[in-house]
């Protein structure tokens, strides 16, 4: 990804491969109507990998980065950007690129919310965690997801070497109406408890074994496991039989594979309700 894509420091410079940039630009061209007067902004342009492609969409482009690695990029912290110089009621602004992710995607969310304050569309390379409803629910409700595509393995380079960061390219569009926010499910027939409270099973939350269920929880870490107590009155063995075949999309994240509480709730609710006698 760009020099500012995953981390904002001189030691971790990720660059998006040209072919990946081309695919992203093609999707923007296919799904977004860009008029001659519209403005395109790349908020974290890094080494300028998106410059050529964006200029192919429109001559009106602005490229910013807090630490530019290309002479065509203006030095600016996008989170402090003001669009007063572009205040034109007939001009729509389209924000395109690869924002910094930050810890648990905190910076990516900030970049999205900043862009959402003035943009008509937001087209970003994002961590795969943005395929999860819990992350999508953090995006302003007036924006609707109109397209997304998983990026292939090794879409980026660091110091000239292929680098695999699980990412997705998403296009969000501003509309007059708010999108439906997926409600947070509540556990049915079970509850999450702390390890010191009586519980029946542990569920591995993170790592290559994410999703694995175990009744032997003595040595299970509170940092990497959920602890669950069944409340439906059924035998523990019957409940385990109901949930043991659950499959999670554990690759929808950057870094170690992980399963969120909402994912566990949805999966357990469905499995336990399906097997009610």
Label every PLM stretch briefly.
Residues 1-277:
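Class I S-adenosyl-L-methionine-dependent methyltransferase catalytic core
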């Amino acid at each position: 990804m760009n020099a500012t894509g995953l981390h904002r420091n001189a030691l971790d410079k990720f660059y998006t491969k040209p072919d990946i940039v081309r695919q992203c630009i093609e999707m923007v061209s296919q799904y977004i109507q860009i008029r001659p007067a519209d403005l395109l902004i790349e908020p974290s342009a890094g080494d300028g990998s998106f410059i050529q492609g964006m200029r192919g969409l429109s001559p009106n482009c602005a490229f910013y980065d807090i630490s530019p690695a290309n002479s065509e990029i203006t030095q600016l912290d996008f989170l402090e950007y003001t669009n007063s110089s572009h205040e034109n009621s007939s001009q729509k602004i389209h924000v395109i690129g690869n924002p910094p992710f930050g810890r648990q995607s905190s910076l990516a969310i900030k970049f999205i919310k900043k862009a959402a304050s003035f943009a008509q569309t937001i087209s970003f390379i994002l961590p795969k965690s943005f395929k999860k409803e819990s992350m999508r629910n953090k995006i302003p409700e007036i924006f609707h997801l109109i397209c997304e595509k998983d990026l292939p393995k090794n879409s980026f380079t660091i110091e000239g070497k292929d680098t695999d960061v699980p990412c997705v390219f998403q296009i969000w569009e501003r509309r007059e109406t708010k999108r439906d926010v997926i409600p947070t499910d509540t556990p049915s027939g079970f509850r999450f408890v702390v390890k010191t409270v009586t519980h029946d099973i542990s569920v591995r939350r993170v790592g290559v074994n994410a999703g694995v269920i175990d009744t032997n929880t003595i040595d299970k870490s509170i940092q990497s496991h959920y602890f669950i107590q069944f409340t439906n009155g059924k035998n523990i063995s019957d409940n385990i039989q109901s949930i043991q075949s659950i499959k999670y999309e554990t690759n929808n994240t950057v870094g170690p594979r992980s399963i969120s509480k909402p994912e566990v709730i949805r999966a357990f609710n469905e499995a336990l309700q399906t097997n009610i006698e």
